[in-house]
Amino acid sequence: ASPFDQIAILGFAGFVFGGFVELEGFHHWPRRGLIIVAPMVGLIWVIARAGEFDLTIADRNFVVFIFVGVLIAGVRTSRGKGSGLTAPTLLVAAAGGLFVLSWINGNFDLAKISAVIGMSIGGFFAWNWPTYRYPPGAALVAGAATSLAAVAGILVLDGRVSGTSVAILGLIFFSDWLAGFVSFGGGQVGRAMRPLLVIAVAAGIVAVAATVSA
């Protein structure tokens, strides 16, 4: 299967799995655990099917780093604390980062896939900003995170993007924590500005990753 097919299959599987988690009404910790597992399984799938790639020791090391990054991403996006827009904001930023790295390194197919994933999550974000309406469900988080994990894995295995730059993108999932050092107050304006500040911090991280990759 092509990378596009793999990502589409994994994204759909993550979405369905997340929907199952949502419908079954798992309590907080089991729910988090299952959401965290989904993107990690997606990355394992990509690595297991990577026989067409010639993996060096450095590549294997970076795959381990990406695996750890995916674990961190799952932990950070499955939390119940904070704004309901936190997880979609981080996932949109991650998709944007993968788009930039793919594009500047000439992997336009993965860039397009990253853009589609980002715009899909961005639609949910736009519907919930500046007025928050609906919390992100497990289907959205698991589906998007699984797709992005697959993109990150394929990007590293393809060899056109340095593993270091992709690993740096993992810091995006701490953007909300870094943005927390700036306070806009607890009113409606403050709540509306927080996701934008998270995106601004994430954009800085993407810029660093792009510089390293160039």
Question: Where do the model's predicted regions map?
Answer:
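N-terminal topogenic module of multi-pass integral membrane proteins
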Residues: 1-80, 178-214
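Generic multipass alpha-helical transmembrane bundles of integral membrane proteins
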Residues: 35-157
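C-terminal transmembrane helix-loop-helix hairpin of multi-pass membrane proteins
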Residues: 111-117, 124-214
